[in-house]
Amino acid sequence: MSLDAILSGAGGATKLGAQMLNSMPVLLIPGLGGSPRIYAPVADALWGFGPVTVANHVRDDTMGAIARRILAEAPPRFALAGHSMGGYIAFEIMRQAPDRVAKLALINTQARPDSPEVRERRGGQLARVKAGGLHEVLDGLYPGFVHPSRHDDSTLRKLVHDMGDDVTSEGFVRQLTAIMARPDSRPTLATIRCPTLVLSSDTDNTLSNTLSAEMADGINGAKLVIIPDCGHLPQPEKPRETAEALVAWMQN
């Protein structure tokens, strides 16, 4: 089956792909302020391998509680992909239930906790969102989310706003609270034994490639893929390149 067939879903690729690969469930976790919309550009390619679910990560305010609830609702064994905050949650899932994760993809994320400076900045964002300024905070984050060539992309900016509305101000506050208190996941890297993809972008102004390389170096056998001319949101910015990397990960 060709990559084009898998990516397009043409010619019965979804059903056939699931049969060929014993229908591995795929669990996707969005980032801060992200909703299932973030994975829409690449989800069809993954349906060729099994059922695809996007986790609900807005209901709890600690990484431990978020991971426990996701695990309670997840299949017994699955391929796990986490984007940004979703990567922080993925690390917590690896600590709680490593044997349930068949494959791991860490997308534009990091293993380090927030520095005091970043935590202080997030505290300001938290206060503004609580005061009703969710879209104001998202507009402030947007330039760091995307490649400079997309700063004036009204469609992409609308996606960020729409996802924020999906999450709601209350959900965003819970997410930020969990992020600010998350543990250092660098000690977890050496414990990961499943096939792992570390996917990053060459122009991610939110989380640098140095952080991606640190994760790839720390996980035995991990593969590092860097998407060119792309910011922090590779799924909508570079959907084909992102889908190709994820399909190769699932085929590994």
Indicate where each model-derived feature is located.
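Conserved HGGG/HGGXW glycine-rich cap/lid loop of the alpha/beta-hydrolase fold
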Residues: 20-69
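Short beta-strand/loop motif that positions the catalytic acidic residue
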Residues: 192, 198-200
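Catalytic histidine neighborhood in serine/cysteine hydrolases
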Residues: 213-232
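Conserved alpha/beta-hydrolase catalytic His-Asp/Glu region
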Residues: 114-117, 132-191
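Acidic catalytic loop of the alpha/beta-hydrolase fold
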Residues: 203-207
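Flexible "cap/lid" loop of the alpha/beta hydrolase fold
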Residues: 63, 95-96, 100-139
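Catalytic histidine-centered segment of alpha/beta-hydrolase-like enzymes
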Residues: 230-243
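Gly/Ala-rich beta-loop-alpha elbow adjacent to hydrolase catalytic centers
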Residues: 82-86, 90
